[in-house]
Structure formats: C-alpha cells, structure tokens
Amino acid sequence: MKVLFINPPIYDFSAFDLWLKPLGFLKIIDLFKKNGFEIFYFDFMDRNHKFYNNIKVKKGKFGCGKYFFKEVEKPEIYRNIPRKYKRFGLPVEVFIEFLKDIKNPDFIFITTGMTYWVLGIKEVVEIIKKFYSRVPVIIGGIYASFCYDDAKNLEVDYIFRGKDIFKFSYDFSSRFGIDIKIPDILKPYWGVYEKLDYLVVKTSYGCPFSCWYCGIKQFEPEYKKRDFDEVVEEIIENAEKFKIEDIAFYDDALLFNFDEQLYKILEKVKRYNKNLRFHTPNGIHPKFIKKEVAYILKEANFKTIRLSLETIEKNRIEESGYKVNFSEFENSIKYLIYAGFTKEEIGVYILAGLPGQMPNEVINTINILRNYPVKIKIAEYSPIPGTVDFKIAQKLYPDLPISNPLFQNNS
C-alpha cells in the first residue's frame, strides 16, 4: 500500500528556517515504513529541493536560511496590519508536477504547524482533493490538536489530536481496518530527504514544568526521557549519512537531569564525531546551568545557547511557573562567560504581548539585560488554545476573536 506525506507551505508575515523540520511527522513516516507501506513525501519547506538551484536565496549560518516566498493577498482579519503577507515554500507548480508521478495512493497524511499557518493546510487539502477525491486524508500536528473545531471545517477524513502513537495506531486501525503495529524503536525517518543541512533531535518528550503560556502538556502530558544510546545512534548515524555538522535540540527541558541524560549523550557522541556543532533554539532553563555544566557545553561545541528569562516581573514569575528567577539567570551568564561563550553565542528570550502585560514590563527587562553580554531575543506571545494564558486572554479581551487561528499570529 502507498502513503503520501505532505508538509504544507507557510502563510505568514515572516518565516525563516531556524532548524525547522516536522520531527513528529517523520516519526509517523517511520511507523508506516516499518509496517511495510510504500512512502512518498513532499516537503514544501525543503530548501534543498532542486527548485532552489535556479534561484538566489540567502543562506544563513549553521544550516539555517531563508525560504523562497511570494507576496499574497492578506486575509481580511489582517487588513489593517501595515506589513506584506507572504506564502513561503515551494511553488504550487512544483507540487503538482510531483503529484503527477504518484498514482493512486491509499492514504494521504498532512502535518500541521502553527495554528495561524492554516492557509497552507487549506491550500494542500484543496489540491489533494482535486487529484485524489476518494483517497482518505488525515491531518495531525499543532493546528489539528489545538484548533480541532476549526479543523473540522476542512475537507479531511480524520483529524488526529496529540502525539500518543498508541492511540493513533488504534484509531487508524479501527477506522480504516488496517492493523498498524508499533515497533520497539520508533524514531524520525530522515531518509525521505535527499540532502540535509542540519539534524533536529529530542532527547526527551514533554516537560516537567507547567508554564502558563506553553501548550506542551496538551501534546505530551508526561515528561519522559528517551534511551540515551538510541539518541546517540540517531545523531551519529544521520550525521554520517548526510555529512551534517549542525545538530539542534528540540527539547523543552534539555538540561533537566543533565548528568543522567544530556551529559551521557554528549560524552558518547564525541567518541564518534568531534566535529559536530550543537544548538538550543528552544529556551533552556538558566537554573540548570552550573559551572561544570557550562564547561561541558562549551567543550561539546555548543554554538547557540538560548536562555529563557521571559520577564523580571516578580509577580508574573511567581504566579505562572516561568523558568527562572533573576539571580539564577545572573549565575548562568557568569558561568557561560567563564566557560568561554561569547555574546554572539548567548541569546536571551523575553516574552512580549502576554495577556495583561504592560509595555513597561518588557522595556524594563530589556534595559536590565543591556548590562549583560547577551543578545536580547524578544519572543512575541502567541495565544495557544487550552493554555492558562489563553483563558486569561479570553477574559481580558472578550471582544477579540482569539479563537480564530489567524488571530493567534504573534505578528
């Protein structure tokens, strides 16, 4: 049987490939491959597609870079925003040429990213239905999980919510009458790409913390470490296969239980490959950066450190379960600098646009951070359905259409 997997284009005001890959989707592909299905894959966001050979798009550092884009008409809800709205990713024509070679797939899977990227999902569904009107279409991912009611308006046959692979296997088997067995080891199947500039990895699932703005608990309710030997094998195998130097960690709590997890992974990896560079695009917890941890990260060749400070406002920190207090943050910076990290390598995330947040809170945080050798990274708040902050926003701003996925765009 044949299965077609699709990662849609992005419709947004801006988009940049900052180690962006559909990691969970690649695990679903691995599941079907190990169950004997023939796999076809199209990633609109693949910057290594041959289409890019004929255009000039600037590449960034460490495998990151810009996407091909085309300006498009803004949806009505954005009409007063004085910015250009764009469609990022491979052109529709490239996708259609690809589909012409895929005869009668048995199932079609579409992953969904940020809730406000919904227009890319709609585009793909509409095209797919023209080509394969009777083929079952299944969607999953972030938008499908957090905006389930909105997703029901799409012309799809099944919407999977969350990341429970056992539930997915049961639901799929029950609905379509095909037994899907869960293998002992399930990991992202990178073989769908001919070339990669970087690898993204998770050493754990879920998060032991419960920040008010974060939706991870709805996706992965329990924190669980992966087998570190399995992670090491995944890194070494794919780094060698694709000649990769850059590895980005997707963990929500990368340094949690450092000695028992990440430290062991780094120690084993360097025995096989000492030329890798590591990056932490997700904010890490400053309180876990002790002196020895900072030196280990430096020795392991971490090039991108992103710390989550979020705010210096004490009441918000105490109420909302955020990742750090300021003294822990100061210590983490001290240890990182002592270990040899530079200002260019240390970025600090602060949140802006939280429900009820006044501009002075953000300004004060920025002014204080200017006294430290770090790059300030403002993370604009995006309301995630089901989170505590989303419910607060609904109460504070009852007249705003917060439940509309397009309105959840932080731009």
What is each of the regions a protein language model found here?
Residues 148-154, 292-293, 355-370:
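Catalytic cores of alpha/beta
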